[in-house]
């Protein structure tokens, strides 16, 4: 059996998870700039590779196909790349294989926000662009929000982003990462 070498903490991908519309892409881009790393939005990368938008993939090929492509891409990025900032789609982390790969090979940050804040501030901005929200009542979306919390609870660090500007959230993540590096891999 081949022994896998652990990825040094400073070289691990930094992975942002959280509910749709939490700001993973915006915050991820800022973190990438601050740490001089490449940024990969998993949904945008899927769209690029598939040659169609996420809503088109859902409509033409179905959610199961999308989740398979998403899972394969994330596992590949986690196991075969380093020094990246990855922004996962809101439902990606619900897949056990994705969670295992992210936790084993990356540093996972959960961008957390309250239901009330999300409903008032974020939902109006994204309601028409997310296939998962299509034809759902507010009660069904609330149920989805809370169902996903148990998967999101499996992370390395959490940033509560209610009322935070994207820049402030990015600064908190960078400070947390640098602290981890200093504590767990000093003098590198």
UniProtKB/Swiss-Prot annotation:
Transmembrane segments: none annotated. Its EC number is 2.7.1.71. One of its GO terms (molecular function) is ATP binding. InterPro entries: P-loop_NTPase, Shikimate/glucono_kinase, Shikimate_kinase/TSH1. It is found in: Cytoplasm. It catalyses: shikimate + ATP = 3-phosphoshikimate + ADP + H(+). Keywords: Amino-acid biosynthesis, Aromatic amino acid biosynthesis, ATP-binding, Cytoplasm, Kinase, Magnesium, Metal-binding, Nucleotide-binding, Transferase. Mg(2+) binds at residue 25. Its cofactor is Mg(2+). ATP binds at residues 21-26, 130. GO terms for cellular component: cytosol. Binds 1 Mg(2+) ion per subunit. GO terms for biological process: amino acid biosynthetic process; aromatic amino acid family biosynthetic process; chorismate biosynthetic process. Pfam families: SKI. Signal peptide: none annotated. Catalyzes the specific phosphorylation of the 3-hydroxyl group of shikimic acid using ATP as a cosubstrate. Belongs to the shikimate kinase family. PANTHER family: SHIKIMATE KINASE (PTHR21087), SHIKIMATE KINASE 1, CHLOROPLASTIC (PTHR21087:SF16). Monomer. HAMAP family: Shikimate_kinase. This is Shikimate kinase. It comes from Geobacillus thermodenitrificans (strain NG80-2).
